Amino acid sequence: MPRLIKDRVPTPERSVGERVRDFGEVNLGYSWELALREAERCLQCPVEYAPCIKGCPVHINIPGFIKALRENRDNPSKAVREALRIIWRDNTLPAITGRVCPQEEQCEGACVVGKVGDPINIGKLERFVADYAREHGIDDELLLEEIKGIKRNGKKVAIIGAGPAGLTCAADLAKMGYEVTIYEALHQPGGVLIYGIPEFRLPKEIVKKELENLRRLGVKIETNVLVGKTITFEELREEYDAIFIGTGAGTPRIYPWPGVNLNGIYSANEFLTRINLMKAYKFPEYDTPIKVGKRVAVIGGGNTAMDAARSALRLGAEVWILYRRTRKEMTAREEEIKHAEEEGVKFMFLVTPKRFIGDENGNLKAIELEKMKLGEPDESGRRRPIPTGETFIMEFDTAIIAIGQTPNKTFLETVPGLKVDEWGRIVVDENLMTSIPGVFAGGDAIRGEATVILAMGDGRKAAKAIHQYLSKEK
């Protein structure tokens, strides 16, 4: 029985004073020595019973990859090679999920060690394996092995949307021998990984490497293609044997507050897309400036709100997060909240906008806020915010609204016969097939705004379902 070590090995981070001046990654990740020390804490639960595996949406063999690190302690390259081989069976994007997954709610939340101490830092170990493999060319060697083993079956599948669900589905299908083409509306593939998550959380070079690996598997990626406009859905159905829709939830949810259309008010989607995809923070090197005032209000309490707030802070603003519940009810990851607090983002709880106030030129100058109190839990399990009727005014010259996103109705309206629910989410059966035979969907397009790993889980499930569906055809 391994000796129980209650305290996890901390990961190095850049100092606050250094990191707030640029968009470089905050968490520096484990070295081999630190990763091995953390791996030693794992109790090695039997795979068939391991709670961490059950807590992972893609069911990575977590004890298995950690065991590979421990058993090859004198040979880091061999350790990482075996660990990556195990991870890749279930997760093709470990460098990404190791950074952005809410492990504390999933694998780490289920960890047995967490009942008496800190759970194993599974996410950071996964990231270490992926980073070490990339830096030492190990992933290229393993990928070459996989490519050599692919046997083409002559069938074609189209993927609409190059986000986490689409990329995962494409990778799995390519390994099964399908000819896969991804159609992406934007000029860069990656979806939320590229336009939604800032560099300081997910460096874009990592995403680009994963995309390069996908292309090496034989996947074609067509950008600047808006299905329904550039090419019709019916044309895709005629050309391909099956279709997967992974168009995400890219339409911002905006509440109709008075004054919400004033200059200086952004959706978090637009704000982060300009910064992440169009490199607004590098103006004039990139000609996509974004105007951020001296006092910025970010409305919301999820990861997107934290990303927007921390980005605005790096552009030189004084930033406030305004949230209608308390810190306890925030949906953002604890690590992201902690980083925002460390960096100087200010939090105001139990408030919600009543109206936005403009100056004579139509620019935002203040927000009237209403104080809230907490009532009984709602359907989310969190206590419901209740208006008190008490209001006050705070001066802000920029506001970023981060209260959620919904699926893109523009695309959905171009697909005749596709059934959606009242929220605009695509309706699917237990195999992720839509109301149209041979057309599957997953990720935020069926869930609404969710996590990267849940979208990847859908992509993996859909790939298996597509394979079963096409294998049954004569």
Swiss-Prot record:
Assembly behavior: Heterodimer of alpha and beta subunits.
Catalytic activity entry: n sulfur + hydrogen sulfide + NADP(+) = (n+1) sulfur + NADPH; 2 reduced [2Fe-2S]-[ferredoxin] + NADP(+) + H(+) = 2 oxidized [2Fe-2S]-[ferredoxin] + NADPH
GO molecular function, one term: ferredoxin-NADP+ reductase activity
Enzyme class: oxidoreductase
Protein name per the record: Sulfide dehydrogenase subunit alpha
GO CC terms: cytoplasm
Cofactor(s) for this UniProt protein: FAD; [3Fe-4S] cluster; [4Fe-4S] cluster
Gene source species: Pyrococcus furiosus (strain ATCC 43587 / DSM 3638 / JCM 8422 / Vc1)
Keywords, comma-separated and alphabetical: 3Fe-4S, 4Fe-4S, Cytoplasm, FAD, Flavoprotein, Iron, Iron-sulfur, Metal-binding, NADP, Oxidoreductase
Name of the gene: sudA
